[in-house]
UniProtKB/Swiss-Prot annotation:
Region feature MPER, mapped onto this chain: 653-674
Organism of origin: Simian immunodeficiency virus (isolate CPZ GAB1)
GO biological process assignments: clathrin-dependent endocytosis of virus by host cell; fusion of virus membrane with host endosome membrane; fusion of virus membrane with host plasma membrane; positive regulation of plasma membrane raft polarization; positive regulation of receptor clustering; viral protein processing; virion attachment to host cell
Protein family membership: Belongs to the HIV-1 env protein family.
Glycosylation sites: 134, 140, 143, 154, 158, 186, 195, 239, 260, 267, 274, 299, 331, 336, 351, 356, 384, 392, 426, 432, 446, 450, 601, 608, 616, 628
Region named Fusion peptide: 501-522
HAMAP family, per database record: HIV_ENV (MF_04083)
TM region(s), chain numbering: 676-696
Site feature (Cleavage) residues: R500, A501
Location of the region described as V2 in the Swiss-Prot/TrEMBL record: 155-194
V5: annotated segments: 445-456, 447-456
Region (CD4-binding loop): 362-372
Protein name: Envelope glycoprotein gp160
The keyword Calcium is annotated on this UniProt entry: no
Length: 854
C-alpha cells in the first residue's frame, strides 16, 4: 500500500509539473510577430541641409578668396577619412543636386563681398566729351601675339568735388569699345551699359585668385561619393563611399574651357542631362590636362580721379604699349591629341563614329560666350578660341589672341557690371585645361548624321557640376522598426524596477555607415556599437572643429554668414535629442534594441517570413519597403506606451503598501481612524446580522427566547440525583448559554468567530482546489496515457499494414514476374515451332514428291 501511495504521489507531482510546463510553453509555440524598435541602423534619405565650407585660407593674404574663406569657412580637417560601403547601390543625379546651388550662392557671396567696399560708378553716368588720343605703341609686340590695336578716346567730364555744390572737369582715357556714342554728335559719349547696368568698380587689390574650398556636411548628415570610373553623373553607382567633406574645389569663373579642375579616371567622360535638346550643355572631363599659359605684356600709368566725396575712380593716365592686348599659349600637339580623344568620347556618347563629330568656333552671342573669359591677375581676359575649335589644328605652339576688358558683364545677376581697374606691370598666369563646355547645333535624336559641337558658357553652375557630380548629401535615419518573435514583458502584478543602462560614447562617425551593405541580421548584431558611433561622431566632429578653431584662433575671423554655417553643425545634436525623445515616448529610451507589445500586422511587409528579410535584405532596402507603414506603426507604439504607463501608474498606487515605515506617518492617522471606525461599524453590523440569522434559525426549530440577556438553564433529566456537599451523587449536567458582557469581549468574540470561520472556509476552499487540481492532473495524465496507447496502437496498425502491403507488393511482383516468364516461354516456343514448320517445308515437299514417284 505504501508503494502504491508513493507512486500515486509521484504521479500527482508529475501531473502538476506537466500542467505548469504546458502553460509556460504555450506562448512560445505561437508564431505571432511583434514590432521591435532598432536604433543605430544604417539607413539614410536624400537631404538638402546647409553645408559649411572648409579651406586652408591665409588671413595675411589680401586676395579676395582668402579674405572670404577666413570669414566664411573653417579650417580643413587634417586627417580626412573615407569609408567604403560594400554591396551598396545608390542613385546620383548631378543635374538635381542642391550642393551645386549652395556652391553657386557661396561664390556669388564671395564676389559680392569682394566688391562690396568698392565704389559704385553711378556718378560716371554723365556725358563724356571725347577726342582721339594719340600715343606711341610699343614695338616689341608682333602681330602673332597681339590683336589689332584699338582706338582710344581722351574724354573729359564733370564730377562733383569734395564740396557737393561744386563741380570740376577731369580727364581720362577710355577705349572705344567701353564707350558709346550719343546721337549724331561725334564727340559726345557715355560709358557702355551705363543706363541699364549698375557698374561696380573692383577694388584695386582684388585679384580673384581662387583657392581650394571643401564642402562638408554637418554631423548627423553624410556625403556619399560615387567612385565608379566613367560615371555619367546620373543613375546607379555601385562603388559608393562616405566622406566628411568633398575634395578641394577651385571656384574658377570661366567660359568655354574648364580650368584647374579635377581630371577623369580612365577615359574622357561626357555628361549631358538630355541629349535630345540642343540647348543642354555637354560637360567634357579630360583625362590629361593641357597647359594654358597666358601673358599680358606692356605697362601703363594708373591715375586716380575723385568723382565725389570719398569716391575714387582709377583711370588710365598714360599708355605704354597696348595694355589691353594679351595672348595665351597652348601646345598644339597635346591639344590635337586631346581633341581627337574628345571626338571619340562624344561619338560614343551620341552613338556615332568620330568621323561624324566636328568641333567649331562659337556661333555668336555675348563676348563672354564667344570668347574664353577668365580672370588672370585681376584683369579679365577675353581670348579668341577659334584656332583650337576647328578641324585644322597646328602641331606647333598655338597662340590665342586675347583682349582685356575694363567693363565686364556680371555673371552673378542680370543688370550688373564690374569695372576692373588697370593693373600695372606684366601679368602672367599658368593654368591647366581640365574640361570643355560644349553645345550641339542639332539635337541628338538618332544614330546617323554629323554633329557639330561649339564651345559655350555663361551658366557657372555647369562648372560646379563638373566637380560635384559624384557627391550627394543624405540625412542619417538611425531609427527603424522590424518584425520579430520577441515581445516586451509588460507590467502585470508587480512593479518592474529594472533600470535601463545608458551606453557610453566612442568610435568614429563614418564607421556608423560601414555596415550599410550588410544584411539586417548581420547589422543588427552591432547595433549597440553603431548607436554609440552615431552620437560619438557628432561629439567628435564638434571637438575637431573646436580644436581647429582654437589652433587658428588668431587667423579665423568668422563673419555673420560664417557663424550661420557654424551653427548648422549643431543641427545633428538637436536631431539626436529628438530621436531620444521619440524613443522615450515609446518606452525605449537608451536602448539599441527595444521589444514592444504592438503586434505586427499581417498586411505589413515581412509578415510571411522573417528569415527572408533578416538574411537577404539590407536596412536600406527594408526601409524602402516599410516606409509607407512607419507612420501608423509609430502611432501604435505611442498608444501602447501610454497604456503601459497607465498600468504602471495604477500599480504604483498599490506600491505604497511596500514600505511599512510609511504606515507610521502622522499624516495618515486620520485615515487610520476612518478605517478603524469603518471596521468597527462593519463588525457591529455583521454581529447584528449573525444574531438575526441565529434567532431566525432557532425560531424555525421551535425555540422562543425570553430575553437575550438572561441565562437559560437546561432542564435536568428526570431520575438523576443532585449534587450533595459530601460529593455524592452524579454531577449536575445542566448547561447555560454563555453571555458575553462588555464591548471589548464582544468584539473579541466576534473577531475570533469570524477568523475561525474564515480559516475554515479558506481551508475548505484550498482543499477543494487541491482536489480539483489532482482530478485535473489525473484526467490529463489519463488523457496522455490514452493518447500514448492510441499512438502505440496506431503505430502497430501502420506497421502491420505496412508489412501486409510489403508482402502484397512482393507477391504481386512475383506473380507478375512468373506470368511474364511463362508468357515469354510460350511466345518463344511458338516462335520455335513456326521456325521448325518453315524449315521442314522443303523436307515435306521432297517427301511428297518421293511418294508420288513411288
Amino acid at each position: 500500500m505504501k508503494v502504491m501511495e508513493k507512486k500515486k504521489r509521484d504521479w500527482n507531482s508529475l501531473s502538476i509539473i506537466t500542467i505548469i510546463t504546458i502553460i509556460l510553453l504555450t506562448p512560445c509555440l505561437t508564431s505571432e510577430l511583434w514590432v521591435t524598435v532598432y536604433y543605430g541602423v544604417p539607413v539614410w534619405h536624400d537631404a538638402d541641409p546647409v553645408l559649411f565650407c572648409a579651406s586652408d585660407a591665409k588671413a595675411h593674404s589680401t586676395e579676395a578668396h582668402n579674405i572670404w574663406a577666413t570669414q566664411a569657412c573653417v579650417p580643413t580637417d587634417p586627417s580626412p577619412q573615407e569609408v567604403f560601403l560594400p554591396n551598396v547601390i545608390e542613385s546620383f543625379n548631378m543635374w538635381k543636386n542642391n550642393m551645386v546651388d549652395q556652391m553657386h550662392e557661396d561664390i556669388i557671396s564671395l564676389w559680392d563681398q569682394s566688391l562690396k567696399p568698392c565704389v559704385k560708378l553711378t556718378p560716371l553716368c554723365v556725358t563724356l566729351q571725347c577726342s582721339k588720343a594719340n600715343f606711341s605703341q610699343a614695338k616689341n609686340l608682333t602681330n602673332q601675339t597681339s590683336s589689332p590695336p584699338l582706338e582710344m578716346k581722351n574724354c573729359s567730364f564733370n564730377v562733383t568735388t569734395e564740396l557737393r555744390d561744386k563741380k570740376k572737369q577731369v580727364y581720362s582715357l577710355f577705349y572705344v569699345e567701353d564707350v558709346v556714342n550719343l546721337g549724331n554728335e561725334n564727340n559726345t559719349y557715355r560709358i557702355i551699359n551705363c543706363n541699364t547696368t549698375a557698374i561696380t568698380q573692383a577694388c584695386p587689390k582684388t585679384s580673384f585668385e581662387p583657392i581650394p574650398i571643401h564642402y562638408c556636411a554637418p554631423a548627423g548628415f553624410a556625403i556619399l561619393k560615387c567612385n565608379d570610373k566613367d560615371f555619367s553623373g546620373k543613375g546607379k553607382c555601385t562603388n559608393v563611399s562616405t566622406v566628411h567633406c568633398t575634395h578641394g574645389i577651385k571656384p574658377v569663373v570661366t567660359t568655354q574651357l574648364l580650368i584647374n579642375g579635377s581630371l577623369a579616371e580612365g577615359n574622357i567622360t561626357v555628361r549631358v542631362e538630355n541629349k535630345s535638346k540642343n540647348t543642354d550643355v555637354w560637360i567634357v572631363q579630360l583625362v590629361e590636362a593641357v597647359s594654358l599659359n597666358c601673358h599680358r605684356p606692356g605697362n601703363n600709368t594708373r591715375g586716380e580721379v575723385q568723382i565725389g566725396p570719398g569716391m575714387t575712380f582709377y583711370n588710365i593716365e598714360n599708355v605704354v604699349g597696348d595694355t589691353r592686348s594679351a595672348y595665351c599659349k597652348i601646345n598644339g600637339t597635346t591639344w590635337n591629341r586631346t581633341v581627337e580623344e574628345v571626338k571619340k568620347a562624344l561619338a560614343t556618347s551620341s552613338n556615332r563614329t568620330a568621323a561624324n563629330i566636328t568641333l567649331n568656333r562659337a556661333s555668336g552671342g555675348d563676348p563672354e560666350v564667344t570668347h574664353h573669359m577668365f580672370n588672370c591677375g585681376g584683369e579679365f581676359f577675353y581670348c579668341n578660341t577659334s584656332q583650337i575649335f576647328t578641324d585644322n589644328i597646328t602641331n606647333g605652339i598655338i597662340i590665342l589672341p586675347c583682349r582685356i576688358r575694363q567693363i565686364v558683364s556680371s555673371w552673378m545677376r542680370v543688370g550688373r557690371g564690374i569695372y576692373a581697374p588697370p593693373i600695372r606691370g606684366n601679368i602672367t598666369c599658368n593654368s591647366n585645361i581640365t574640361g570643355l563646355l560644349l553645345t550641339s547645333d542639332t539635337p541628338v535624336t538618332n544614330n546617323s548624321g554629323n554633329l557639330t559641337f561649339r564651345p559655350t558658357g555663361g551658366n557657372m553652375k555647369d562648372i560646379w557640376r563638373s566637380e560635384l557630380y559624384k557627391y550627394k548629401v543624405v540625412r542619417i535615419e538611425p531609427l527603424s522598426v522590424a518584425p520579430t518573435k520577441a515581445r516586451r514583458h509588460t507590467v502585470a502584478r508587480q512593479k518592474d524596477r529594472q533600470k535601463r543602462a545608458a551606453f557610453g560614447l566612442g568610435a568614429l562617425f563614418l564607421g556608423f555607415l560601414g555596415a550599410a551593405g550588410s544584411t539586417m541580421g548581420a547589422a543588427a548584431v552591432t547595433l549597440t556599437v553603431q548607436a554609440r558611433q552615431l552620437l560619438s561622431g557628432i561629439v567628435q566632429q564638434q571637438n575637431n572643429l573646436l580644436k581647429a578653431i582654437e589652433a587658428q584662433q588668431h587667423l579665423l575671423q568668422l563673419s555673420i554668414w560664417g557663424v550661420k554655417q557654424l551653427q548648422a553643425r549643431l543641427l545633428a545634436v538637436e536631431r539626436y535629442l529628438q530621436d531620444q525623445q521619440i524613443l522615450g515616448l515609446w518606452g525605449c529610451s537608451g536602448k539599441a534594441v527595444c521589444y514592444t507589445t504592438v503586434p505586427w500586422n499581417n498586411s505589413w511587409p515581412g509578415s510571411n517570413s522573417t528569415d527572408d528579410i533578416w538574411g537577404n535584405l539590407t536596412w536600406q532596402q527594408w526601409d524602402k519597403l516599410v516606409s509607407n507603414y512607419t507612420g501608423k506603426i509609430f502611432g501604435l507604439l505611442e498608444e501602447a506606451q501610454s497604456q503601459q504607463e497607465k498600468n504602471e501608474r495604477d500599480l504604483l498606487e498599490l506600491d505604497q503598501w511596500a514600505s511599512l515605515w510609511n504606515w507610521f506617518d502622522i499624516t495618515k492617522w486620520l485615515w487610520y481612524i476612518k478605517i478603524f471606525l469603518m471596521a468597527v461599524g462593519g463588525i457591529i453590523g455583521l454581529r447584528i446580522i449573525m444574531t438575526v440569522f441565529s434567532v431566525v434559525r432557532r425560531v424555525r426549530q421551535g425555540y422562543s427566547p425570553l430575553s437575550l440577556q438572561t441565562l437559560i438553564p437546561v432542564q435536568r433529566e428526570q431520575g438523576r440525583l443532585g449534587e450533595i456537599d459530601e460529593g455524592g451523587g452524579e454531577q449536575d449536567r445542566s448547561r447555560s448559554v454563555r453571555l458575553v458582557e462588555g464591548c471589548l469581549p464582544l468584539i473579541w468574540d466576534d473577531l475570533r468567530n469570524l477568523g475561525i470561520w474564515s480559516y475554515q472556509s479558506l481551508t475548505s476552499l484550498a482543499c477543494n482546489v487541491w482536489r480539483q487540481l489532482k482530478t485535473l492532473g489525473h484526467l490529463i495524465l489519463h488523457s496522455l496515457r490514452l493518447l500514448r496507447e492510441r499512438l502505440c496502437l496506431l503505430g502497430g496498425i501502420i506497421q502491420y499494414w505496412g508489412k501486409e502491403l510489403k508482402i502484397s507488393a512482393i507477391s504481386l511482383l512475383d506473380a507478375t514476374a512468373i506470368a511474364v516468364a511463362e508468357g515469354t516461354d510460350r511466345i518463344i516456343e511458338a516462335f520455335q515451332v513456326t521456325l521448325r514448320i518453315i524449315r521442314n517445308i522443303p523436307r515435306r515437299i521432297r517427301q511428297g514428291l518421293e511418294r508420288a514417284l513411288l
